[in-house]
Amino acid sequence: IEQAIDLDDSYPTLLTLARLEKRKGHSYILKSIFNLKKIYPDIQYIIAGEGDQLENVKKEIKNYNLESNVKLVGTINENQKKFIFSKTDIMIMPTIDETHANSIEGFGIAYIEAAQYGIPSIASNVGGTPEAVLHNKTGLIINNFNELDESIKNLVENKQNRIELGENAKNRAENELIWEKQVVKYNKLIDDIQ
């Protein structure tokens, strides 16, 4: 995968690590990348995952002429994930609110995985996502897709803010969200109840 991802480390790289489903918002991200490419011609975006929207995503990449900006890497293993996180500056996954769908957005483990690497996230105010990404603390929460371009632009242009959000995300992941620490908290809670 290292050969497939030839990235310029001097420019921020965005990542979506999720199944390719309509509700994960890939189409909105690609539209934003297209819009922002006018300002940042070298913007880089990695899509890791597979799903029923793969062909649609490929068509959109071609229609927006983003072949040199977007890398589709498919399903990745843990070692590949570590490599990709080492190349990522911004995690982005603006899930669509599908209130009446069979599947809703849970906590968002991918955000926490990114946080462990000091990567801030851009996410939607949907389901359990605001519990995983704290707005203006560990990333940015958007309320609608009109805010997506501006949120990406904010983190691309403001490196210091991006670094601070990433550090906050990493500290929170290490100190509050690691499973072992959660188990201790739950055990204490159970003991207190008894």
Would you name each region that the model predicts?
Residues 55, 77-88, 116, 134:
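Short acidic alpha-helix that forms the nucleotide-activated donor recognition element
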Residues 86-104, 119:
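Acidic donor-binding loop of glycosyltransferase active sites
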Residues 154, 161-176, 182-188:
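A short, well-ordered alpha-helix in the C-terminal region of glycosyltransferases
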Residues 7-24, 30-33:
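Conserved donor-binding/catalytic core segment of Leloir-type glycosyltransferases
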Residues 111, 115-116, 120-123, 133:
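Short hydrophobic beta-strand element within catalytic cores of glycosyltransferases
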Residues 58-79, 90:
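Nucleotide-activated donor-binding/catalytic signature segment of Leloir-type glycosyltransferases, i.e.
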Residues 102, 123-136, 140-143:
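Short acidic/histidine- and often glycine-rich active-site loop of Leloir-type glycosyltransferases
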Residues 135-146, 154-160:
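Conserved acidic donor-binding segment of nucleotide-sugar-dependent glycosyltransferases
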